Amino acid sequence: MRSNIKSMLICFFDQKGIVHREFVLPGHTVNAAFYVEVLAHLRENMRRKRPDQWRNNTWLLHHDNAPAHAALLTRWFLTDNNMTLVPHPPYSPDLAACNFFLFPKLKMRLKGRRFQTEEIPAELQAVLNTLRENDFQECFKNWQRRWDHCQASEGDYSEGDAGH
């Protein structure tokens, strides 16, 4: 019998690698209050892991338009903490780096294997640990191509387009 236990990973990364990641416990919902806590942890990790970007406030945040991301509480937190947000066009899952880069890599490495729920975070972390700086650099080159394509097509969504 196939199990459809879902494990949620929230992950923030830049061209150098993963800055912050959190696993959401099964049964928990990512609402605005939870997401603001995650963003507070992200800020702390940015301060620790990318001190120059933190000091100069040269880092940007990109996330999709999920309800927790677009909520008023989240927007207040971003404003109050002077966090610069890269806007995400609506209905553009192909522009979310986690969707086209990170999650496919995780799925590819874990596909066909079975885990106990409590094993999932360690297994995901093991896959994350295999990613190298050049993987993240390629991701952002791909992201730029996708943004260029989106802009050239005036935002028309074209799933599976060769430009991706």
Protein language model features and the residues they cover:
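Surface/interface recognition patches
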Residues: M1-H164
